[in-house]
Amino acid sequence: MNTEPTWMAEVVFDENGLIPAIAQDAETGQILMVAWMNREALAETAATGRAVYWSRSRQRLWRKGEESGHAQDVHELRLDCDGDVILLKVHQNGGIACHTGRASCFYRRLEGTASQAEWITIDPVLKDPELIYK
């Protein structure tokens, strides 16, 4: 007997059983991070209202904030037009989404002309990662 929710049938997972998941601040619209979800992570996120991802490096569920305390409360889940990307509109507890101690993982901007361009860090570290991940 299949206990998977009916809405899950519309979600298109890749050949590894994963789907990219974009976390966006529900109030400001700022993109915080991109991670991956499998069926179990998506189902748990929908059931609990807390962001759960699949860690490809650790090969296990990653409950955002389980080590750092920077959990994500999910206000809304959206599925893109092709069904192959999830958008989570979240409240980022502690204001830090990135393991580098920044608000967003997108803290570098490409500046300069194409042949002379370089990535420039534009967002500050809000908290030393050494203090976050003790």
UniProtKB/Swiss-Prot annotation:
Annotated binding of Mg(2+), by residue: D80, D82, D84
Domain of life, per lineage: Bacteria
Compartments, record wording: Cytoplasm
Name of the protein: Phosphoribosyl-AMP cyclohydrolase
GO terms for biological process, alphabetical: L-histidine biosynthetic process
Required cofactor(s): Mg(2+); Zn(2+)
Subunit details: Homodimer.
Broad class of where this protein is predominantly found: cytoplasm
Similarity comment text for this entry: Belongs to the PRA-CH family.
Alphabetical UniProt keywords: Amino-acid biosynthesis, Cytoplasm, Histidine biosynthesis, Hydrolase, Magnesium, Metal-binding, Zinc
Catalytic activity: 1-(5-phospho-beta-D-ribosyl)-5'-AMP + H2O = 1-(5-phospho-beta-D-ribosyl)-5-[(5-phospho-beta-D-ribosylamino)methylideneamino]imidazole-4-carboxamide
Cofactor note text: Binds 1 Mg(2+) ion per subunit.
Enzymatic class: hydrolase
PANTHER family listed in its UniProt record: HISTIDINE BIOSYNTHESIS BIFUNCTIONAL PROTEIN, HISTIDINE BIOSYNTHESIS BIFUNCTIONAL PROTEIN HIS7
Molecular function in Gene Ontology: magnesium ion binding; phosphoribosyl-AMP cyclohydrolase activity; zinc ion binding
EC numbers, comma separated: 3.5.4.19
Role this protein plays: Catalyzes the hydrolysis of the adenine ring of phosphoribosyl-AMP.
The species this protein was found in: Bordetella parapertussis (strain 12822 / ATCC BAA-587 / NCTC 13253)
Gene3D superfamilies cross-referenced by the UniProt entry: Phosphoribosyl-AMP cyclohydrolase (3.10.20.810)
GO CC terms, sorted: cytoplasm
Sites where the protein binds Zn(2+): C81, C98, C105
Biological pathway: Amino-acid biosynthesis; L-histidine biosynthesis; L-histidine from 5-phospho-alpha-D-ribose 1-diphosphate: step 3/9
